[in-house]
Amino acid sequence: MFEGFMVNTWIVASIVAVIAGLVGFFVVLRGSAFVAHAVPSGAFAGAAGATLVGTSTLLGLGVFSVLGAIGIGWLGRRGRHDVATALALAFMLALGALFLSMTGEYAPEIDSLLFGEVLGISTTELLPTLALAAACVMAIAVLYRPLMLSSVLSEVAAARGIDVARIEVGFLLVVALATTMTVPVVGALLIFSLMIGPPAAARSFTSRPA
């Protein structure tokens, strides 16, 4: 239970639980559950592309998570947000399929991104996870007040001079950071559940946003 790899597992699992709950609170509050599904699922294209060029899958995952978040934010300004999210997801999944077909070989590290590898976290992988978690917490702390207001009353936030569109993009980037740190641990399928399930259950006990 307290062997080296299990200690890493306990630490990383605890960090993932905190970050998923923190980011998921705003995901549920903003009604952006589809985004929490699209960014992790579509980011596997980055891992596939990284495998194709022979670089770190974590780097590829992070790049495509950020690009996907920016794409959703950019398209969302020009039309319905759910349609923009669906288009970004379809595009990233198509790229992922293309990259996988170009590799011409089985890539187990890509498949593991669907379900995660919580027992396979090494000490060297622990440090990037801690850094990304700290970045998520700092970003939420900086954006907290305008993000909270724009999530609850976007018209009031805009009337007070808050750039709602910029806050939206900033929050999408936070989701991208959370995706980059959590998907290798618990997988793209489970992180969606962790971001949505507990915050949605918590909201059923109170009508107050915070």
List PLM regions with ranges:
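Helix-loop-helix "hairpin" substructures at the membrane interface of multi-pass membrane proteins
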Residues: 16, 125-198
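Membrane-interfacial amphipathic/re-entrant helices at transmembrane-helix boundaries
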Residues: 1-18
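Juxtamembrane/transmembrane-helix boundary motifs in multi-pass membrane proteins
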Residues: 4-8, 53-57, 77-81, 112, ...
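Hydrophobic alpha-helical segments embedded in the membrane of multi-pass proteins
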Residues: 18, 22, 40-44, 66-67, ...
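Alpha-helical transmembrane segments of multi-pass integral membrane proteins
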Residues: 12-16, 60-61, 124
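Hydrophobic core segments of alpha-helical transmembrane domains in multi-pass membrane transport
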Residues: 13, 17-21, 47, 66-70, ...
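Transmembrane helix-bundle core of multi-pass membrane transporters
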Residues: 6-8, 78, 85-143, 170, ...
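Short loop segments and helix-boundary regions at transmembrane helix junctions
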Residues: 25-106, 202-210
